[in-house]
Amino acid sequence: MRTDTTRGPLVAGLAVALLASPAALAAGPRDCAGLAALAGPDLWIARAEALPAGQLPAENPGRAALTGAARTQAAMPAHCVVEGMIAPRQGVDQRRYGIGFQLRMPEDWNGRFLFQGGGGMDGVVSDAVGAIPVAGATAAPALNRGYAVVSTDSGHQGFDSSDASFGVDQQARIDHAYAAIGRVTETALNLIGAYEGRPPEHRYYMGCSNGGRTALMAAQRFPTLFDGVVAGNPGFRLSRAAIAQAWDVQALNRAAPRDEQGRPILASALTPEDLQLVSQGVLKQCDALDGLADGSIDAMSACRFDPATLTCGAGQTQSCLAPAKLEALRSVFGGARDGQGQSLYSTWPWDAGISAPGWRAWKLGTSPTGTPNARNATLAAASLGLYFMTPPKPGLRLAEVDFSRVAAQTAQTAAINDATATLLSSFVARGGKLLVFHGNSDPVFSADDLRAYWRALGQDNGGEADLARWARLFMVPGMNHCGGGPALDDFDPLAAIEAWVEAGRAPEALPARGGAFPGRSRPLCAYPLEAHYKGQGDTQDISSFECRPPSP
């Protein structure tokens, strides 16, 4: 592998200083337990242990839903694991804070380093194995490929990844927004250098959801740290997405039946049959636009669905949408707006994935009572009130959000949290590569919003062709948040970014499969190209499809 000579002075200086330090010299190469000697006032090391090859426990299902990195029990290679905390301190609320991390370094190291992104509001340190952050992926985790992998809680310790109570602390907000990326990377590189006796030759960042946001942050705010960045379903404009989630809850509650206490039952605003009706309506209108009616809308740009076609006629009560439900859908898909009708968040694309369990889990939930369990409702209430709003509003109820004021209330955190920058000249100049993927049926972060950002990124970077030299976007038809839905959600973005960075092979398309369509393979085309059936050949095989520009 090539050695990159364009490293910034910060990283180079840290590596030299560490390798020359008495503690590092005392530890010696491949002395895992000896890494504990690197602890100091600003670095706690709770564990430094050499582990034999074994089995990795399965990811917590709730956590996996936030990161996409679902996995069954997998074989784990022999490796050194280090766990600790950076910059421990006492916060303004008398809580203990610090940036927790876990680093795993395999015995058969390939010279690569991966920063594994988190999900939700973070607050927990996930197993640093580098699982591919898309639910259907069958590709091996990065650790099994020989990567050294680090993970973090982003600077606070929560009861789970929906806990936003850290938002009352200024430094905790900053750490979660972006600063933990730099601190954890610095520490991980120091530990790798001490253990291996040399720094990594290539450095990568990969995550989905909030981990996708921090992946973009890695490229935008730390442009000299990473060679390649993979951002999946990124919550890049998360402050506005949280507002949109409040908007959606209010819109859907207006169509929902009430419980005995008069509370709206969010999960019943739209039944599974309602969503299946919409999905079938979208497929009927748009499925064949890519040359083949097969349950997947690859010609996403050409799909113009009007839900009014599903309106109940006089005396009709089945296989149609009542006016209140139709209005709720129009409000949600039209995007959040303020009191003057100005857009607060993007529109959403109509796609077949609306009927999938993942869409319902985020937008509606399954609770039969007036206490909702939709992930958007539970996460947004906490994050909007405690993290995004200044001053914080504990106990915020989404039904009380004032859309004429909420943009101003969230502006301060948006300025440090949202990964909306389009000037990435330093990242590009040192050869950085960016690969982004996103589900067209994501119910959390709108695919329309990401497409708008991508167009702006192209406009500010010399146009579409120049942008494609260092950044590629791959839209996944039917896919929900970080996987799931009627989609081909089994692909390997880590292999693609690695080949691009190290061998110069830019990905024109990502080969994809998925459990929703057994035996099928398709290309996920680099945006704005879309997959089309050639008109002949096996309709289940990737070779029968080509990437074409969208129809004018």
Which residues fall in each region the model found?
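Bacterial N-terminal signal peptides that target proteins for export
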Residues: 2-12
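Short beta-strand/loop motif that positions the catalytic acidic residue
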Residues: 436-438
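Cap/lid segment of the alpha/beta-hydrolase catalytic domain
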Residues: 110, 118-197, 243-244, 251-252, ...
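A catalytic-pocket lid/entrance helix-loop region that shapes and gates access to the active site
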Residues: 217-219, 224-337, 475
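Conserved alpha/beta-hydrolase "acid-adjacent" motif
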Residues: 444-448
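Gly/Ala-rich beta-loop-alpha elbow adjacent to hydrolase catalytic centers
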Residues: 207-211, 215
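Catalytic-loop region of hydrolases
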Residues: 26-112, 125-128, 136-137, 279, ...
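N-terminal signal peptide c-region/cleavage motif recognized by signal peptidases
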Residues: 20-24
